[in-house]
Amino acid sequence: DTLYAAGFRMAGLTHFFDNDLAGSMHGLKKGGLTPLGQQVVAAMEAKGMVVDIAHCSNACVADILKLARRPVVSSHGGVQATCQVNRNLDDDQIRGVAATGGLIGIGYWDAAVCDTSPASIAKAMKHVQGLVGIQHVALGSDYDGATTVRFDTSKLVQVTQALIDAGFSDADIRA
């Protein structure tokens, strides 16, 4: 309620540690949603908020996807098919997010795409597009000052060019 009153319309339940709501992909236990976490997801959805699974453990992602009645988002991360990092989503999780009508944001840092090149970003986006459709993939930069990336926002044209080089149509890029 506090976050909603402050104007938030999307929130994640975890970051780098397990907490009273859910297990983090970076946590010690990496558990699923707690009973309180289940209540929070239901309350967020009742208010029209979007649940972000970006730092959730695999068990947490599975629990959220089972409960979801609204689109779920992974705001920033990668995909296992192109970068086998623990935090990245596997194909079943990608399909699960898409089944909610949700969106997967592809990050720009090495742990998301195993490299910092625009071509690696495009490769991950191409995988999601091929698996579930362009409407379920987006850029998920995570420009927060703590993430090391190859380029700043003034160089986003490099990502656009990489998308063109990877075969994305103008309509896909605008989607």
Which residues fall in each region the model found?
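Mid-to-C-terminal alpha-helical segments outside catalytic/metal-binding sites
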Residues: 151-175
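Short acidic/histidine-rich active-site segments
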Residues: 107-108, 132-153
